[in-house]
C-alpha cells in the first residue's frame, strides 16, 4: 500500500508543478494485454495462483499529461482490461482489471535536440495502483495493490497538435509478483502547443556613441562701410603735394584698393590772394594733383575719382590773417564705399 500512496502523490503533484507547461490529452488508448501464464499456472506466484486463469483481452485507457520540459513529460492514466476468467467452473465468468498510473516519459529530444522531428521515440517509467474484480466467489472477489510500469514507444507527429502514439509496456504486480504485457496505440493531443527550449539570449553589442560631427557655424555675410576724409595743405600759388602729406595720400590709396567699389570726391580750395580766374584754375590744379598721385603712383582707376575747384568760395578760416589763409589753401577729399565680407 505504501507504493500505492506514492503513486497517487506523484499523480497529484506533478501536474501542479508543471501548471504552466503544455497540456497533453490522450482521450483513447487501445491495446491488447497478455497476462502472465506463469502467474496463472505457476505454483508460488501469489494468491491468485492455482485459482482461475486470467485470459488475455482488450486494453482500453485514457491519459492526461503535461510537458515538464521539451523532452520530459508526465501523464496521469486510467485503463482497464475486461476479460474471460477460466477455471471457475461457472461458464461466462469474467474479471475486470483497472489501473490508475502516474508515468514519466523522456523523448529522444534529450539527446538529439531535434525538437521539430516528426518521429520521437521515448522511454516510459511509472507506478500506479491496480484492482482486480473477479466473478469467482471461491477466491478473493477483489484484489488490489501496487504496480510499476516500464515501456518504450514513439510519437508520430501529424502536426503541431496531433500525434499518433504506439507503445509496448510491461507492468509488474508487486503484490502478486508477476508481469503482464500490453501493446497499445492512441491519439495524442497537445493543447497550447509543445514546449520548446527558450530562445538563446542574444547579447547585443553595446552601441558606441558616435561623436557628433562638428558643424561649422554658417558663415555670416556682413557689409562694411567706408567713410574717410583727406586734407592736404599747399603753399601760396603752389599745387604740388608736400612730402609731409604723401603718407595721407597713401592711406587713401590703400582704402580704395581695399574697397573696390569705393569712390573719392576731391575738392580744391584757395585763399583770396590774386584774381579769381587764377584761383579757380589753382584750386582745380590742386585737386588734380591729388588725383594724379593716386592714379600714377597707386594705380587707382581714374573713373573712381572726381575733382572740382572752388577757388576762395568755401573758406574754413579768416582770409584776413596769414594763418587763416594757410588753412584755406587746401584739398579736401571724401572717400565713400562699402564691401561684403564673410566671417
Swiss-Prot record:
Signal sequence annotation: 1-21
GO molecular function, one term: porin activity
Chief location category: membrane
GO-annotated cellular components: cell outer membrane; pore complex
Matching Pfam families: OMP_b-brl, OmpA
Residue ranges annotated for the OmpA-like domain, each copy included: 221-339
Family stated for the protein in its record: Belongs to the outer membrane OOP (TC 1.B.6) superfamily.
Function per UniProt: Porin. Binds peptidoglycan.
Quaternary data: Homotrimer.
Protein known as: Outer membrane protein Omp38
